[in-house]
């Protein structure tokens, strides 16, 4: 009798994706983050669903409904903090996942990579509208400042911002539509993630060497299922340490003050995972220039396949490129730090230098280093 998992129309899809999938025998723990992102997404959808059962998207009651969830709903506090800190874990996994793709040249899978970039944008949009929902001070002012950036678009900017707001300022209409967006976007992310996986399985996974591994494949189950479960346990351990011991570590104290349009917080800043882009935005004195730099800081990822000048796919055997890659990581950490600092000397200068460094590394230095390495191979 033929195994049902190989013949049943639905189970066949699951089997080909998670059980009998031929996987390279040498993929390291950096390949765990795709499955961890899947776990994060499921966790966020589930906790978000339970939060939505008690949340009200009205400016008068939004803040108190979140307080009600934490105080009066059974285990509401843990659901709320798992959702808030789950977003941070999501972005940590995302950044590592993208970094892995850059390091090992996974961007040569064009469709998979471009859908991944769209996914990154969608997750960032979801996190942004989600941050507005508790209707604290930073929620309100973050929404005002970031949506206002669109007014820099020539000719249609002001109309576009007022259309997004649903009025002449961030108000009830804005909060209601942001809640609607925050509810629907995770399902769009799920569909995109499935497409991402579909295109990945057309080519098969990359591996640390960047060399085709067709002659050396092993079944995904049990080898990588066990490996993924270990990663999942570590992820949940770190998440629960955050939730149970320091739930507000990554949040902003200003968000425990109800939104007040008449009082501006001293330092308006987004959540930590947007700080690198926020620092790039602030480092340019011109509004439109800043908005373009902000968009380009992520869009530059779509250029990676075009900027790949090396004869080797992976950075595993390219010490010069490795060095520049880790400088890029340090630069992003610097930008993240600067984004959380007030706009004053010396932070302005550091931010501008780090922003120049960011684009120089990706657009000029790394392709140049790859060409130097190509020439070294001829020696």
UniProtKB/Swiss-Prot annotation:
Cofactor(s) named in the record? heme b
An example Gene Ontology biological process:
mitochondrial electron transport, ubiquinol to cytochrome c
Please tell me where heme b b566 binds in this chain: 97, 196
Residues holding a ubiquinone: 201
Can you tell me which residues bind heme b b562? 83, 182
Q: Which GO terms describe its cellular component?
A: mitochondrial inner membrane; respiratory chain complex III
Instruction: Give the membrane topology, semicolon-separated if more than one.
Output: Multi-pass membrane protein
* Keywords, comma-separated and alphabetical: Electron transport, Heme, Iron, Membrane, Metal-binding, Mitochondrion, Mitochondrion inner membrane, Respiratory chain, Transmembrane, Transmembrane helix, Transport, Ubiquinone
Q: Which family does it belong to?
A: Belongs to the cytochrome b family.
Q: What is this protein called?
A: Cytochrome b
Q: Which organism is it from?
A: Okapia johnstoni (Okapi)
């Amino acid at each position: 009798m033929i195994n049902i998992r190989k013949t049943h129309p639905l189970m066949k899809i699951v089997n080909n994706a998670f059980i009998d999938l031929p996987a390279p025998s040498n993929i390291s723990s950096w390949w765990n983050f795709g499955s961890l992102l899947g776990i994060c997404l499921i966790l966020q959808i589930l906790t978000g669903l339970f939060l939505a059962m008690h949340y009200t998207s009205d400016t008068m009651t939004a803040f108190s409904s979140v307080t009600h969830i934490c105080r009066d709903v059974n285990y509401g506090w843990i659901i709320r903090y798992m959702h808030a800190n789950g977003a941070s874990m999501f972005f940590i996994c995302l950044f590592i996942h993208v970094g892995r793709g850059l390091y090992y040249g996974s961007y040569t899978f064009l469709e998979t990579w471009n859908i991944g970039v769209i996914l990154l944008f969608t997750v960032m949009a979801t996190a942004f509208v989600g941050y507005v929902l508790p209707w604290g001070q930073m929620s309100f002012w973050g929404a005002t400042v970031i949506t206002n950036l669109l007014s820099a678009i020539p000719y249609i900017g002001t109309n576009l911002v007022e259309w997004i707001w649903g009025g002449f300022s961030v108000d009830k209409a804005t909060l209601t539509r942001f809640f609607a967006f925050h509810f629907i976007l995770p399902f769009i992310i799920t569909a995109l993630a499935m497409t991402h996986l579909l295109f990945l399985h057309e080519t098969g996974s990359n591996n640390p060497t960047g060399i085709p591994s067709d002659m050396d494949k092993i079944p995904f189950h049990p080898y990588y299922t066990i490996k993924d479960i270990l990663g999942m346990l570590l992820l949940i351990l770190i998440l629960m340490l955050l939730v149970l011991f320091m739930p507000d570590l990554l949040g902003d104290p200003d968000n425990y003050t109800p939104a007040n349009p008449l009082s501006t917080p001293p330092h308006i800043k987004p959540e930590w995972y947007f700080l690198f882009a926020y620092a790039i935005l602030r480092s340019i004195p011109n509004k439109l220039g800043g908005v373009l730099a902000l968009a380009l800081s992520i869009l530059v990822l779509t250029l990676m396949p075009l900027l790949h000048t090396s004869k080797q796919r992976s950075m595993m055997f390219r010490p010069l490129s490795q060095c520049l890659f880790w400088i890029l990581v340090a630069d992003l950490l610097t930008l993240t730090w600067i984004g959380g600092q007030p706009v004053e000397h010396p932070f302005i200068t550091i931010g501008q230098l780090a922003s120049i460094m960011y684009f120089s590394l990706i657009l000029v230095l790394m392709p140049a280093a790859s060409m130097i390495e190509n020439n070294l191979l001829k020696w």
